[in-house]
Every structure is written in C-alpha cells, then in structure tokens.
Amino acid sequence: MDIFREIASSMKGENVFISPPSISSVLTILYYGANGSTAEQLSKYVEKEADKNKDDISFKSMNKVYGRYSAVFKDSFLRKIGDNFQTVDFTDCRTVDAINKCVDIFTEGKINPLLDEPLSPDTCLLAISAVYFKAKWLMPFEKEFTSDYPFYVSPTEMVDVSMMSMYGEAFNHASVKESFGNFSIIELPYVGDTSMVVILPDNIDGLESIEQNLTDTNFKKWCDSMDAMFIDVHIPKFKVTGSYNLVDALVKLGLTEVFGSTGDYSNMCNSDVSVDAMIHKTYIDVNEEYTEAAAATCALVADCASTVTNEFCADHPFIYVIRHVDGKILFVGRYCSPTTN
C-alpha cells in the first residue's frame, strides 16, 4: 500500500490506479541483478515465492526481460529469469513495435502502447510485467437501476455520473471509526476467488486522511471487521487509465540506491548499467456486469465497526481495492474525478 500512498499524495484531486503485483514483479527482476545496498533496498519489494503463479481464471500475469543482443549477462541472473529472457536489438525500431504488440495482446488491447517512444541505443535491458483481470460480479447490477446521480468531487463541486444501484442484497460491510476519520467499508464479490473492497469516508472531503493511514495492516484489520448484512449499494460506473513514472515515488520510499548511476547491478552483467526509468500503465473498467483491469510496468536499464447502516452510496471520492480471497492485493485505486476518466 505504500507505493499507492506515495503516488496518491503527489496527485491530489486525480484518479489513481495501480497494480502492486505488476510493480513488484519488475522490482524482483531488478533485485536478481542487484548487489550491495541496491539489493538490500530492493529486497523489501521482492515478490514472495508464495505469491508467484497464482494466476486464476480472472487474473493472469506475464513477465518478460529483453536484453541487448551484444551484452554479456551473468549466468546466475539468467538462471533466475529463466525462459522469460530474450535477446533483442534495441536499435531496431521494430523491437519497440514487437514489445508493444506483446503487451497489447496479453492485456486484450487495454495497454497500448506501453512504450511511447523509441528506446535509447544505450538500453541494455528492458524488464516488463503485465497483468490482466476480468471478472463478473457474483451479484451483477441491473442496468435498469443505473441512472444519473450527483457525485461530489468536493463539498462545493458536483458532477453527474452513471450510478449503478443494487437493493437489499447481503454484503460484508462495516462502519469504522478511527482517530483520523470515520468511514464505511464494503466487499463486493466477483465470481471466483476475488472481490472489490470499497472504502468510503463519511465526509465528502475525508479521503486524504484515510489514504495517509492506508497500510497493509490497517486494511486487513478493517476487512476483518466486516460482517454480512443486507444493504443497498450505489457505485459509479467508471473507466480510468493511468500512466506513471514510478522513480520519484520509489526514491521517496527509500529506494535511493536503485535508480541512476548509484545503482549496483553487478550481478546482472559485466558492464556498468543504470535504471533510468520505471513506467507503469494501467486501465480499469467497472460496469454493471464485470470489472476489467490491466496494468503493465517496465524498467529501462541503461548503460473497527460501530453503528450499522443500510445504505452504501459512493457519491464522493473513495478508495477501491481488488484482492484475492487469500488477501493478496491485485489492484488499488482512488476514484475522485469523474471528468478525467
């Protein structure tokens, strides 16, 4: 959750949507080639072995590592990467097209292009992780109940949205009171082993303080506090795309020896290399029938419950988390600006 908090704090008033597993996969690839303090800092974000290969019918992931054909990579690094490694000519313009096409096909056309510009001839390695998610609601919203509804961007600004509604169904829900604010939390299940958890502050302008305290520990505590109850649910239909250079956010989180000339990647190849960029692109579509989401990340390496309510109306900024039944967070986002979908 810390990467989400850092990005959200730097993009006030904007929609945010990221995929932690996609980011973690690329950082893990970098970790395989890192040494010294660079490896020590990256170790915090290394993908746990238990989280690998957890793709199911709704969520799938792909990792690819492209290395410059003339570079000499160390055997220990290549063994860890395995079949995901491929040598290419980064000076050939067709290479970018081929990489973009690979991500485009995997994400069902939702991330295209991943790379907007030709790669530098100094590029030694390109690490890519793409994820794709599409799942039907266990209890779909009836389209006939969707209607225009005011969404309060702020206490003084309102925008009409297409609000989906469902009445009298049972969902896990809690009203939470914390020192930093009060909010409601609800879990909307998908068919299979995933669900969307929505965190809605009681106050229209109360989201920022909740974001600042959104940790993995707190999120688990809030989810554990939910109980099943009959409730009317109102959630906007929305589509959000995102494009982020994660370097600044990750440096602020302590990865000061990972990017630029300070990075030690002596376990990757025999020449001095640096990580100059880390791009993360995302897409999500939430509608009456299903949620569809995708994300791709690439790193360029160069030389407590209280009173129970009976309505959950997301008519002002909220946080949403798509998670697996085992608790693994697949995506996390903030919806606060309908006009920038």
Curated annotation (Swiss-Prot):
Q: Which domain of life is it from?
A: Viruses
Sorted keywords for this record are: Host cytoplasm, Host-virus interaction, Inhibition of host caspases by virus, Modulation of host cell apoptosis by virus, Protease inhibitor, Thiol protease inhibitor
- What name goes with this protein? Serine proteinase inhibitor 2
Task: Name where it's found.
Answer: Host cytoplasm
List the Pfam families. Answer: Serpin (PF00079)
* Cellular component, GO annotation: cytoplasm; extracellular space; host cell cytoplasm
Its taxonomic path starts at: Viruses, Varidnaviria, Bamfordvirae, Nucleocytoviricota, Pokkesviricetes
Q: Where is this site: Reactive bond?
A: D303, C304
Q: Which organism is it from?
A: Cowpox virus (strain Brighton Red)
UniProt KW Methyltransferase keyword: no
What's this chain's function?
Answer: Viral serpin that inhibits both cysteine and serine proteinases involved in the regulation of host inflammatory and apoptosis processes. Major anti-apoptotic protein which inhibits both intrinsic and extrinsic pathways and strongly cleaves host CASP1 and CASP8 but is a rather poor inhibitor of host CASP3. Prevents the proteolytic activity of host interleukin-1-beta converting enzyme (ICE) and ICE-like enzymes. Can also block apoptosis through host tumor necrosis factor (TNF) receptor.
**Which molecular function term from Gene Ontology is one that the record holds?**
protein sequestering activity
* Protein's GO biological process: symbiont-mediated suppression of host apoptosis; symbiont-mediated suppression of host cytoplasmic pattern recognition receptor signaling pathway via inhibition of TBK1 activity
Q: Which SMART domains match?
A: SERPIN (SM00093)
Q: Major location, coarse class? A: host cell
Family, per entry: Belongs to the serpin family. Poxviruses subfamily.
Listed Gene3D superfamilies: Alpha-1-antitrypsin, domain 1, Antithrombin, subunit I, domain 2, Helix hairpin bin
Disulphide bridges, residue numbers: none
